[in-house]
């Protein structure tokens, strides 16, 4: 049995293993699955920060932080901010707020955020 698990771990893609571990991490913290959220509902989602970028919105800067839980992704938009300490790619974070739909992606404007270990 141990040999079978070792062979399975060595032959599976690293991305698949990382995705499963991230999904288990989010499930253990009772965060909503990102593939099950809908627009205009209050959610608490979390995962790993995939990207951080500054985008001009209505003439003012906005920090967009994309977070993925292995099943989907949500973009946290912090209006009027250029950076937030602790929010960098690879960190794990939870967002809480009301979702909005922008094309195919979900946004949470000025979410309450919590850095996770």
Predicted features and spans:
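OB/S1-fold single-stranded nucleic-acid-binding modules
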Residues: 1-46, 50-56, 101, 106-117
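Short nucleic-acid-contacting surface segments enriched for D/E, G, S/T with interspersed K/R
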Residues: 38, 81-96
């Amino acid at each position: 049995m141990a040999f079978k698990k070792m062979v399975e771990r060595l032959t599976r893609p690293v991305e698949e293993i990382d995705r499963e571990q991230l999904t288990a991490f989010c499930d253990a913290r009772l965060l909503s699955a990102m593939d099950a959220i809908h627009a205009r509902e209050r959610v608490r989602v979390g995962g790993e920060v995939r990207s951080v970028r500054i985008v001009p919105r209505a003439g003012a800067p906005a920090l967009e932080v994309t977070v993925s839980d292995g099943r989907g992704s949500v973009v946290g938009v912090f209006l009027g901010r250029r950076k937030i300490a602790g929010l960098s790619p690879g960190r794990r974070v939870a967002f809480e707020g009301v979702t909005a739909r922008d094309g195919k992606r979900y946004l949470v404007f000025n979410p309450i955020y919590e850095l996770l270990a």
